[in-house]
Swiss-Prot record:
Residues 187-196, 256-266 have a biased composition (Polar residues). Disulfide bonds: none annotated. Residues 191-250 bind DNA. Gene3D superfamilies: Homeodomain-like. It comes from the Eukaryota. It comes from Homo sapiens (Human). A motif (Antp-type hexapeptide) lies at residues 155-160. Residues 79-125 have a biased composition (Pro residues). It is found in: Nucleus. Sequence-specific transcription factor which is part of a developmental regulatory system that provides cells with specific positional identities on the anterior-posterior axis. The keyword Nucleus applies. This is Homeobox protein Hox-A3. Keywords: Developmental protein, DNA-binding, Homeobox, Nucleus, Transcription, Transcription regulation.
Length: 443
């Protein structure tokens, strides 16, 4: 019983077209014959009968072939009676399947038999109706199923391409329209837009408008576009480029003015601002001092002391920082031809640091490569005019190499209201201090 049911089930499942890889039963020769014979609608019912008969014998493949041939003969002999042949096969399968097993358990396996046997015919019915050979109908059945997705797959990319083409066309058309202005970014990188050539009249009008207003409002832009026969986009982009150019020019001018403003402020030393301060500027900027002829005191720069003796106190505040006591300079031979005193600080260190004002807040001053100190016991010492020509002509060296009197100049003490100066007749050459730079310790 169990074996019979097992064989029946195997036969039923063997009749399924899903048992083999090609979609047909293991007995490849079993189905073509009933399929080829069953050209009518009733052939669908004969094939399960044969399939049920072939497993009922429980034989090997040769017996199955014989049974299939017998079924073929029985089915092919009376093709003129399809309804009579179509009805009995529905009923005979129970008696054919009944002998192998007793009747009580038979109803249990039998109901599953028609139910599984019923589904195969519709699945395999479509191929036999299309052609006589099963392999070709199977391929034909598979081909539409396969062709439809492939066709759909071929259609979808084509549709996408068409959409992309339409998008590209629209973008190219829009870019072409906007390229009429020759300023719009092209739709594709390959296509280069032409450079806009403005006429001189257009440039003049644009420059005029930019001169009055760097940022253009839309109404004015529309008006200018109509006036100059340009597009708004062209005018807008021209103004953008012009503003960038203007900023660049302003930045360049700012750099030039800043550098030019610094260099003139440093290079020319303002006269009469103070001895050491001016000397610092002159030394930093390396302004060479051009030694003049021995009588430079008749042509002194502004704020120097080479003026008549009456103007010494007036010219003092403009030449040096205000000293604690007012310093007066006395001339030895003021009446002798009106020649002013020898003033070693006529050019207060504006040259190369050889002369300086020896009275800035009582600090020692480096004069002519040496320090000058006063004679404290002589009161307000006067310069000897007898030695002035000699000192100014021969002994004076503006480069600081002249053999001037050595010594130190001390600031006015509490008992010395006026600074005094040594008589520069003693030509003691200062050893080792001729090329020495001034020591600016008070700044």
């Amino acid at each position: 019983m169990q074996k019979a049911t097992y064989y029946d089930s195997s036969a039923i499942y063997g009749g399924y077209p899903y048992q083999a890889a090609n979609g047909f039963a293991y007995n490849a020769n079993q189905q073509p014959y009933p399929a080829s014979a069953a050209l009518g609608a009733d052939g669908e019912y004969h094939r399960p009968a044969c399939s049920l008969q072939s497993p009922s014998s429980a034989g090997g493949h040769p017996k199955a072939h014989e049974l299939s041939e017998a079924c073929l003969r029985t089915l092919s002999a009376p093709p003129s009676q399809p309804p009579s042949l179509g009805e009995p096969p529905l009923h005979p399968p129970p008696p054919q399947a009944a002998p192998p097993a007793p009747q009580p358990p038979q109803p249990a396996p039998q109901p599953p038999a028609p139910t599984p046997a019923a589904p195969p015919p519709p699945s395999s019915a479509s191929p036999p109706q299309n052609a006589s050979n099963n392999p070709t109908p199977a391929n034909a059945a598979k081909s539409p199923l396969l062709n439809s997705p492939t066709v759909a797959k071929q259609i979808f990319p084509w549709m996408k391409e068409s959409r992309q083409n339409t998008k590209q066309k629209t973008s190219s058309s829009s870019s072409g329209e906007s390229c009429a202005g020759d300023k719009s970014p092209p739709g594709q990188a390959s296509s280069k837009r032409a450079r806009t050539a403005y006429t001189s009249a257009q440039l003049v009008e644009l420059e005029k408008e930019f001169h009055f207003n760097r940022y253009l409002c839309r109404p004015r832009r529309v008006e200018m576009a109509n006036l100059l026969n340009l597009t708004e986009r062209q005018i807008k982009i021209w103004f953008q480029n012009r503003r960038m150019k203007y900023k660049k020019d302003q930045k360049g001018k700012g750099m030039l003015t800043s550098s030019g403003g610094q260099s003139p402020s440093r290079s020319p030393v303002p006269p009469g601002a103070g001895g050491y301060l001016n000397s610092m500027h002159s030394l930093v900027n390396s302004v060479p001092y051009e030694p003049q002829s021995p009588p430079p005191f008749s042509k002194p720069p502004q704020g120097t002391y080479g003026l008549p003796p009456a103007s010494y106190p007036a010219s003092l505040p403009s030449c040096a920082p205000p000293p604690p006591p007012q310093k007066r300079y006395t001339a030895a031979g003021a009446g002798a031809g009106g020649t002013p005193d020898y003033d070693p600080h006529a050019h207060g260190l504006q040259g190369n640091g050889s002369y300086g004002t020896p009275h800035i807040q009582g600090s020692p001053v480096f004069v002519g490569g040496s320090y000058v100190e006063p004679m404290s016991n002589s009161g307000p010492a006067l310069f000897g005019l007898t030695h002035l020509p000699h000192a100014a002509s021969g002994a004076m060296d503006y480069g600081g190499a002249g053999p001037l009197g050595s010594g130190h100049h001390h600031g006015p003490g509490p008992g010395e209201p006026h600074p005094t100066y040594t008589d520069l007749t003693g030509h003691h050459p200062s050893q080792g201090r001729i090329q020495e730079a001034p020591k600016l310790t008070h700044l």
